Each structure stands twice: as C-alpha cells, then as structure tokens.
C-alpha cells in the first residue's frame, strides 16, 4: 500500500499541502499557493472581458469558458482549505483499515495493492492530460500570433485567458508581463482540480477494495461451531459497515464539489462544443478539442468512480447468497440468529451506496445526461449566432 495517494501527495504539495502530515494542519506552506492568488487577482479582468463581449456570441462564449474554469478552480481550492482536516481524518481511517486488513492475509493485501496500483496509473494519466491542456493553453496564443504574423505581417496580442486589462497590451513590456501572469495563474486552476479529483478517485478505489475483501471473506467463511460462525460473520459485517460509514463521510465532503462540477461542466461543454463547431478547421479547434477532452474526463471520473462504488457495495448481497452459510448452520436459536443477520445484511447491501451531488447521483447515467444536455445547449447557441 506504499502507492496510496502518492500522485495526489506530489500534486497537492505544489499548493503547500502535506497529505501525510502528523498533525491536522495540512497547509504548511501557504506561499506555494501564489498561483491561486494570481487567478483570484485576474478574475475581475476575465469578468470584464465577458461583459465587454456580451453582444458577440463567439467572443462571449470564449470569455465565459475562461470565467467558468476560473470559478471552478477557485471553488475547488477553497474546498481543499475547508475540508483539509476532514481529508486528514479520512486518510488516517483508510491507512488504519488498510493496515488491519493487509495483516490478516496475503490475499487481502494483494486486493489492496492491485486497487492502489490501478488507481495511481489512472491518476497519473489524468494529471498528464490536465498538464498537457495547460501547456497547450499557454503555447497556443503564441502559435496563433506567429501564424498570423507569417501570413499577414501583423499579429494581435493574445493571452492564455481572454482578459480586458486597463493597460495597453500592444506595448511589448505590458504584453509580456500580462502573458506571464495569465500563464502562471492558469496553474492555479489546474492544480486544485487535479488534486481534489484524484483524491476522490483514490478514496473510491480503496473503498471498492474494502468491499471486495468483505465479499471474499463472506464467500469463504466457515466455522467449526455456530458461535464461531457468528463471530466470523460479525467481523465481516463490521468491515462492510465501516466501509459504508467511510463512504458516507466521503459523500458528505464531496457533495458540493460534485454538484458544482456537474453544473459547471455542462455549461463548459455546451460553450466549448459551440466554439469547436465554429473553429474546428482552424488552429483554435485543437485548443477547444483538448479542453473538451479534459472536461469530459473530469466529469467521467466522478461518474465512473460513483458507479464502481455502487456496484461493489451492492455485490455484497450476491456474495452472501453464494456463501456456504448452510454448511455452518444447525438447529436452534443460534442458527436462526445467523440466518436473520444474513438476511438483514442482504437487504442492506441490495441498495448499495450512492455517491450524490445533492440533486443527482454520480453514475454513468448522469454522465450521459451531462453530454446530452450540453449537445442541446450547443444547438441553442448556434441558433443565436
């Protein structure tokens, strides 16, 4: 389990946080969050660009995408600050339960190791996609300016974010400083998003591993006597209940984040889809396509992890059904007690656990709904242009 949260630890450290801090004050180096303060400072100029271009649908959509990205990045950073002690408490619970289960058998340690290795591969890929999108966002304005100058002998200054500054960016010094500020500030959007989203991914992956261990145990439980069978089952049920409690803690932390993520992702997809449909044959099309991909991946991670958690938690019902419970039962009240506990556990497991964003459940159906809603918004925007 050495790989637990390793990608997340290195990413969130760039914002000054230490996930494995011995005390609950995880934000040890606030000065590292200068990029977040920079995006907060540039926010009014992005808003000014939105208001300035409100009559031009194309420019308005471009500015609105930047505005929504900024809002989501600032919101996620504020949630990291607000929830950092809750995250520390959850991390301690995960590490303790992982240690306890790994000590009970090599097969349980293997389940946990496999889950963490797969999780870290997915989180590394997710982080790479976001960093590539950030690099493309920073480089593409220079590429467009170079092409424009080569073809027409003149280039208008462009920035990573559409901003309306009170100074003249046609002056080289002003432009260079504005460009560096915008490019640096954009990392204040990327790092909180990658950190928060991959932490969720890692938590859900390990919760699924705990549910798999509970299934493994209940399918293979055997007792020499009714008392021993009941004691073994009680330990399995305790693991399942502990996992459900941790699911509930995770859901309480992430409900507002998932709600904001899905709402803003729907708006971003509709505007980026509209911009891509207009500019797909131009250099801007590559930029918008990369952003569409990152936003879809971002929404997909929450839906995929939520779907997996629901499936694994509900599979405990079938594990009980497939278990050799009848081999450990005899006649009498103790036998009836075991049957009753098995039935109650099956009834509870039938519901599974659902990750929610207040008004909706994070699953693949919700992901399809987000994409369909975005497509309908694109049609509406095209009718206005």
From Swiss-Prot:
GO annotation, biological process: detection of chemical stimulus involved in sensory perception of smell; sensory perception of smell; signal transduction
User: What are the record keywords, sorted?
Assistant: Cell membrane, Membrane, Olfaction, Receptor, Sensory transduction, Transducer, Transmembrane, Transmembrane helix
Provide the topology term for how it sits in the membrane.
Answer: Multi-pass membrane protein
From the UniProt annotation, give the residues forming the signal peptide.
Answer: none
Q: Which GO terms describe its cellular component?
A: dendrite; dendrite membrane; membrane; plasma membrane
Which residues point to the Extracellular side?
55-62, 151-175, 277-284, 379-385
Chief site of localization:
membrane
Q: Which Pfam families match?
A: 7tm_6 (PF02949)
Tissue specificity = Expressed with Orco in 40 olfactory receptor neurons in a broad area across the antenna, including both anterior and posterior faces. This expression pattern matches the distribution of the small sensilla basiconica. Expression in the antenna is observed late in antennal development at 93 hours APF.
The UniProt transmembrane annotation reads: 34-54, 63-83, 130-150, 176-196, 256-276, 285-305, 358-378
- Cellular location(s): Cell membrane
**Membrane listed as a keyword:** yes
Keyword match Transmembrane helix: yes
Cite a single GO MF annotation.
Answer: ionotropic olfactory receptor activity
Under InterPro entries, the record lists: 7tm6_olfct_rcpt
Cytoplasmic side of the membrane: what ranges? 1-33, 84-129, 197-255, 306-357
Subunit composition? Interacts with Orco. Complexes exist early in the endomembrane system in olfactory sensory neurons (OSNs), coupling these complexes to the conserved ciliary trafficking pathway.
Q: What does this protein do?
A: Odorant receptor which mediates acceptance or avoidance behavior, depending on its substrates. The odorant receptor repertoire encodes a large collection of odor stimuli that vary widely in identity, intensity, and duration. Complexes with Orco to form odorant-sensing units, providing sensitive and prolonged odorant signaling and calcium permeability. They are necessary and sufficient to promote functional reconstitution of odor-evoked signaling in sensory neurons that normally respond only to carbon dioxide. Involved in the behavioral responses to esters.
User: Which family is it part of?
Assistant: Belongs to the insect chemoreceptor superfamily. Heteromeric odorant receptor channel (TC 1.A.69) family. Or1a subfamily.
Cite the PANTHER family for this sequence. Answer: ODORANT RECEPTOR, ODORANT RECEPTOR 47A-RELATED
The record's misc note reads: The atypical heteromeric and topological design of the odorant receptors appears to be an insect-specific solution for odor recognition, making the OR/Orco complex an attractive target for the development of highly selective insect repellents to disrupt olfactory-mediated host-seeking behaviors of insect disease vectors. Odor-evoked OR currents are independent of known G-protein-coupled second messenger pathways.
**What is the protein's given name?**
Odorant receptor 47a
Give the originating organism: Drosophila melanogaster (Fruit fly)
Q: Which gene encodes it?
A: Or47a
């Amino acid at each position: 389990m050495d790989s637990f949260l390793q990608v997340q630890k290195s990413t969130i450290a760039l914002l000054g946080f230490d996930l494995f801090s011995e005390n609950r004050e995880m934000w040890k180096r606030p000065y590292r969050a200068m990029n977040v303060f920079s995006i907060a400072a540039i926010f009014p100029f992005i808003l000014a660009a939105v208001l300035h271009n409100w009559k031009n649908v194309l420019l308005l959509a471009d500015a609105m995408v930047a505005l929504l990205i900024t809002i989501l990045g600032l919101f996620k950073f504020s949630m990291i600050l607000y929830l950092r002690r809750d995250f520390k408490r959850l991390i301690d619970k995960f590490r303790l339960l992982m240690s306890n289960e790994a000590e009970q058998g090599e097969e349980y340690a293997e389940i946990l190791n496999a889950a963490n290795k797969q999780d870290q591969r997915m989180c590394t890929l997710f982080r790479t996609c976001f960093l590539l999108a950030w690099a493309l966002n920073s480089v593409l304005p220079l590429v467009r300016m170079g092409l424009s100058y080569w073809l027409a002998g003149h280039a208008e200054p462009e920035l990573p974010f559409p901003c309306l500054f009170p100074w003249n960016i046609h002056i080289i010094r002003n432009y260079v400083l504005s460009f560096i500020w915008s490019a640096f500030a954009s990392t204040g959007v990327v790092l909180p998003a990658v950190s928060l989203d991959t932490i969720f991914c890692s938590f859900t992956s390990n919760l699924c591993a705990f549910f798999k261990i509970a299934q493994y145990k209940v399918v293979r439980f055997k007792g020499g006597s009714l008392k021993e069978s009941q004691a073994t089952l009680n330990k399995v049920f305790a693991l399942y209940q502990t996992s459900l409690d941790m699911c509930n803690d995770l859901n309480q932390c992430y409900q507002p984040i998932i709600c904001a993520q899905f709402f803003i992702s729907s708006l971003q997809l509709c505007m980026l889809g509209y911009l891509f449909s207009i500019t797909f044959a131009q250099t801007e099309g590559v930029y918008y396509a990369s952003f569409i991909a990152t936003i879809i991946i971002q929404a997909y991670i929450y839906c995929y992890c939520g779907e997996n958690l629901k499936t694994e938690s509900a599979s405990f019902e079938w594990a009980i059904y497939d278990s050799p419970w009848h081999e450990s039962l005899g006649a009498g009240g103790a036998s009836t007690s075991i049957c009753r506990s098995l039935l109650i556990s099956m009834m509870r497991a039938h519901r599974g656990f659902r990750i929610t964003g207040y008004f909706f459940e994070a699953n693949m159906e919700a992901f399809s709904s987000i994409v369909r809603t975005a497509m309908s918004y694109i049609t509406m925007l095209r009718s206005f242009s």
